[in-house]
Amino acid sequence: KADDPEAFYARFGLKPTPFQREVFKVAEGDPAHLLLAPTGTGKTEAAAFPALARGARLVFVLPTRSLVDDLEGRFRRYLKILAQEEGRPKALVVDTGHRQARFRFSPDGQEEATKERHLYHADVILTTLDKLLYRYFGYAEGVKSYTFPRRIHDRRTLFVFDEVHLYEATAWVNFRHLIASLYKAGVRFLVMSATMPGTYREELLLEGTLEHPAAKRPSRVLRYMPQGNPMEIIQSHRGKRVLVVLEEVKEAAELYKRLKGEGVFLYHGRLAEGQRRRVFRKVKRRDKAQKPYLL
């Protein structure tokens, strides 16, 4: 099953697309590839499943904590199924700086949250770029890290960098240098994006590009309406799922106080980690149930 994408995807009730089968084959070797595919085409599974099927450690790196939160549930489900089918425990680590958690999945279907110090000893590690850089290359006084030389070749490790088009300025420079370091060290990695300018591709050390074929997909029109009174605009869209974006946290907080009630949520980068996650979960539940809300 390690070399059979059809059989491995079937474990989760899925069927691989031609693009996912191609990535599965490329990942057999020593990939240093760019995967270009639109949102919703299964990039996550395309990159992750080859590592899970072959028993490699997967380090999945995202630009933001919210994207890590979004993927956590999916990987918990996958590892729980694998632990039961393979008859051996699996582990997931979530490391975002604000939150460090380790989940152990037993063959009997049990799930246990633990606080072990050796965070990166797991089958799947979900983290952000800034935290990965800190953990692997943190040589400041008092935070010396030997994770990179000690762990990077412990097992066959595959690094996956998703949504890389979101990196800008300093973050992009740091990312580019990290990719160069991994490439020169012979470490396996995949870089994923929905889109990437040619100039950006040229800056990365890559073996090749796998591009998802263009497909006709349903389109959604987003109307940008910066003018007008926010309260009036909101009232005219009652009963719908509405995202209200303001320039400053103070403005958003004041508007939230005026509207506070059922289905009204405030979300911004200064929220405490626990509150941010609670808001995110509630909004996701309403989205799934297609219930109205105001964010």
PLM regions with names:
Residues K1-L295:
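N-terminal helicase ATP-binding lobe
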